[in-house]
């Protein structure tokens, strides 16, 4: 990525990431991105597969790397007081339905993304499905210490996330390399 101009959201954290990965962070609005790619204003961009497909970025970019650097989970939220007033049976229904909805949604996203990737590849885009993630990890291992990050994210949150990742890896024996973005 060294020296490439990559469209990013206007955010201090994205600018810090650019420094760690040695690319040029170029903030451009999403609505202007197609033209920026087409005219060579930027060399690349990062977006979910669905956004790349629906915005036809595959018409103006030749390469795509599935590095899984972000994941945007959806949350089911309910007032705890309301939940606690439900009967055990009603809570069990909600818990069961929540797990079913989560699993179904994840499979639907996986299936839809695979269809979109096939279409993107059919249009001639070279999709790298297994990039060298270790080089990304090494380049960003101290990102959380960057002043742009610490100004926005508390050390306690950072340590909590690191602990959760370590626990996941210990339980699952993997580094979570299969992202959706």
Q: Language-model segments: which ranges?
A:
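N-terminal secretory/targeting leader peptides
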Residues: 2-181
């Amino acid at each position: 990525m060294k020296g490439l101009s990559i469209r990013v959201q206007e955010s201090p954290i994205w600018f810090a990431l650019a420094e760690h990965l040695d690319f040029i962070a170029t903030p451009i609005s999403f609505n202007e991105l197609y033209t920026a790619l087409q005219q060579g204003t930027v060399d690349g961009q990062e977006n979910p597969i669905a956004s790349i497909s629906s915005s036809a970025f595959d018409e103006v970019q030749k390469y795509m790397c599935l590095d899984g650097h972000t994941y945007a989970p959806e949350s089911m939220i309910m007032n705890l007081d309301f939940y606690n007033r439900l009967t055990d049976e009603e809570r069990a229904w909600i818990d069961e339905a929540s797990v079913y909805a989560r699993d179904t949604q994840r499979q639907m996203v996986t299936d839809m993304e695979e269809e979109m990737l096939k279409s993107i590849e059919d249009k001639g885009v070279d999709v790298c499905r297994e990039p060298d993630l270790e080089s990304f990890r090494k380049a960003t291992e101290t990102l959380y210490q960057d002043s742009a990050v610490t100004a926005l994210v508390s050390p306690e949150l950072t340590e909590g996330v690191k602990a959760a990742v370590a626990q996941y890896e210990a339980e699952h024996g993997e580094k979570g390399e299969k992202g959706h973005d």
